[in-house]
Amino acid sequence: DKAFNEALEVQRKMARDARDDKTGRPVIYNTRSIDLASLKVDEGAQGGKIAAMYPAHDAQPVESMEDGKKAAVITDVTAFHAEGGGQLGDTGRIIAPAGVMQVEITKKLPDGATIMIGTVTEGTVAVGDEVKFEIERGRKNDIARNHTATHLLHAALKQVLGDHVNQAGSYVGPDRLRFDFSHFSPVTEEELRRVEEIVNDQILAAKDVTIEE
C-alpha cells in the first residue's frame, strides 16, 4: 500500500546515502582510530561520547558535521539497537551540546561497531561531544511487538504444517512484518485460517514475554 511504499523508499534513500560517492558500494567506515573493544551497547544508556564521526557517504572520519549534513557517528556506548535479521534498527535523536542529529538508520559494522546514520538538523555535532540519546520509543515498541509476532507465527506454522517448517527470511518493521518459510506445497485457505486463529489466540491471551539469550 501507499504507506508501505513510502516507508520503503525512505529506507532505500538512506541506504543510498550510506554508499560511497565514488564506487556506489556500501561505505566501509575507517574505524582504525577507535578502541573497538571498549565500545558498548546498553539499551538503558541515557547518553555517551562521540568516538568517531563521518560524512554518511565517506569512509574517512571527520571532526565535526554541521546542520543539513548527512552524518554517521559511533559513540563509546549506545542505546540504539542495530538492524539485523530483517529487523529494522532504532531511530531517534542524538543531542549534543551545540547541535542535534536525527538518527534514521542504525547498523552494525563488520568489525562489530554500532553506527548511527542520519542528518544533523541543528547546529554542529563533533567528536568528543558528550551526547544524550532520544530513541523513538513508540516505533521501537511496535517493532518489538512484530518481532514477537514472528515467533508466534513460526510456532503456529509448525503446529499446522509440521515441524519441517523453518524460517527462510523476514522483515520486521514498526507497521508490518513478513515471515518467509520453507514448505513443500502452497498453504491452503483452511491452513491459513488455523494459523491466524492460533496466533490471534496467543495475542489475546496477553501472556508475559521473557527474553532468553
How would you name each of these model-derived features?
Residues 1-213:
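A glycine- and charged-residue-rich anion-binding loop/surface
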